[in-house]
């Protein structure tokens, strides 16, 4: 029987993501204990983060951005679990987020301020470096006090530019409309369905992920397997 590879494609670290509440080292330990074979570190890549770093050069900013990923990778080298590079990308046009992986560190240095580019230009750039693009939590809602209700702030604006989207998102701090998610899967059958924990806090551990057959390294192999829809199972909590 071919080995199964249990992978969470949506993990944040406190070193890089301001909303992250778990260090990269601890995240690796927790996922190893939970029986995962690998995680993709997808810290937030957006204008607000890079502006917060002040007047550093772009290369220095990327070194800061990669701290969570690099720390996690060093920790994973002590055991058997694998850590891969990804980003959760957002540009200045909207609040939509996208999981992007399949490129290596060099792309982040060579292509500055991708958040300032149009979605079309940024996605074309990602693909030039072999990356896959999956929309994160496309139908998420947040509570707005002035309206006294939950309002959707994330939408699938560019389905024709996507490889797939998060059908399951394990982070229950937010509301995602399952009816809209299912409707999108039916409307766009060519899009690959994935699952991610959206890990920020220990309570999010192992609430999402995918299972592939085989053993994967480097990240380009994972991107190719997902692109070819070789996912065997979507991991999700009973609450999803």
Regions found by a protein language model. Name each.
Residues 109-116, 168:
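Catalytic beta/alpha-barrel core
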Residues 58-59, 106-112:
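Glycine-rich tight-turn/loop motif centered on a GG-T
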Residues 1-17, 21-29, 93-107, 124-125, ...:
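Charged catalytic cores and adjacent phosphate/nucleic-acid-binding surfaces used
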